[in-house]
Structure formats: C-alpha cells, structure tokens
Design a protein with these regions (language model features):
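A short, conserved alpha-helix within the catalytic core of class I
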Residues: 107-119
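A short beta-strand submotif of the Rossmann-like class I SAM-dependent methyltransferase core
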Residues: 100-103
Length: 200
C-alpha cells in the first residue's frame, strides 16, 4: 500500500480479543504468522507475551525491528523473514499458541491452507491454541472482481481468500473448534470470523 503505516501502532481488535484468551490459558509464548508491520506483535510484547514474529516481506520485518528497538522489546520479540508455505521453523510440540490476523485470506489455495494448518498443529504443544481471523463470505467484497479459483477473488490487484464456516470446519483436522465468532473491522466494513482452535 502507498501508506504502509496506515494501521499505525494500534493493535487490531483481533489481537485484543486474543490477548484475553492467552491470559485465560496462561499462555506466555506465541508465534505470530504474517506479522505485517508488527502492530499486534508489539501489543503482545508490551503485555509480557514472548512473540516470535514471522513475515515474508523484508520491509515488514525491517519495520518491526525498528519498532522493537524503539520500544525496548528486543528481549521479548524475535523476528524472522519467512514464507509460511514452507515447513515452519519450530520443533514439534514446542509452541504454546499461534496467532494470525487475516493471513489465511492471502492468495493461498485450500491445499496451502491445509498444509499450513497441519504445520501449526505439528508445532503446537498438546492443548495448544491457534487463533486466526479470516474474511467471511458475508463480506461485501466476496464474489467481486476477478475470480481466481476456489473462494479467491482479485480486487484492485489484491487477491483475497474468503471463508465460510464450513471451510473453517474443514480446516480443523487435529484441532477442537472452540469458537467461530463474527466481527467487523474498518469503515467498509470488512466482515470477518475470529476462530479459536485447540490442538487435540
């Protein structure tokens, strides 16, 4: 985007909801997948959660690193340039929780998503939590623009993968689906689902 700082440093509403869940489960170490410019990683870090932030964009990682330094959070937030379509760089059963805000809506096929979910399941400890948000099929942009196969649509150069509750259920192999909650974000507004899965 032409204004990479448009999200500012305010955390997403999804991160605020996730923090409450992390504290309920006494979770202290998380992996954020697709950390973007780091607004949620910083929020978790400032709330004493150790964060391992992954993103495939070098400029995003550079931006997070500057914010980590200026907020004195280098002991609590670690970044890594990484493409989440590859095997995640963590041991089996080693992570308390994963968080991703709209990562699953990127230009990922159903097969990519299943593979990502399997990897998240692999790295989570037993009873570990995966929280993710996705654009819903109730969203105003669904079925707009150029259809790119499955539930992927391209608008203004961006490809978005939209999710029904059924698609979310189909992605829960190895997990218990704790909750799927609808919420809205932004002025459009975007319509999303907030998904909480617990590793079985």
């Amino acid at each position: 985007s032409s204004k990479p700082e448009m999200f500012g440093l305010d955390p997403s509403s999804a991160a605020k909801k996730a923090l409450k869940i992390f504290s309920d489960y006494k979770i202290k170490n998380i992996v954020e997948l697709g950390a973007g410019l780091g607004r949620d990683s910083l929020y978790f870090g400032k709330n004493s959660i150790n964060v391992y932030s992954l993103d495939y964009s070098p400029s995003a990682i550079a931006s997070i690193n500057i914010k980590i330094q200026s907020n004195n959070l280098s002991k609590i937030i670690t970044t890594k340039l990484f493409d989440i379509r590859k095997k995640l760089p963590f041991e089996d059963n080693s992570v308390d929780a994963c968080f991703s805000h709209m990562l699953y809506c990127m230009a990922l096929t159903n097969e990519d998503l299943q593979s990502l979910n399997n990897e998240i399941c692999r790295i989570l400890k037993p009873q570990g939590i995966n929280i993710y948000t996705v654009r819903s099929t109730d969203d105003g942009d669904y079925r707009q623009g150029i259809h790119r196969g499955e539930d992927l649509y391209e608008n203004q150069g961006f490809i978005v993968h939209f999710f029904s509750k059924k698609k979310i259920d189909n992605l829960s192999l190895g997990f218990e689906n704790i909750s799927i909650t609808s919420f809205e974000e932004g002025s459009f507004p975007r319509k999303l689902y907030f998904v909480v899965n617990k590793k079985i």
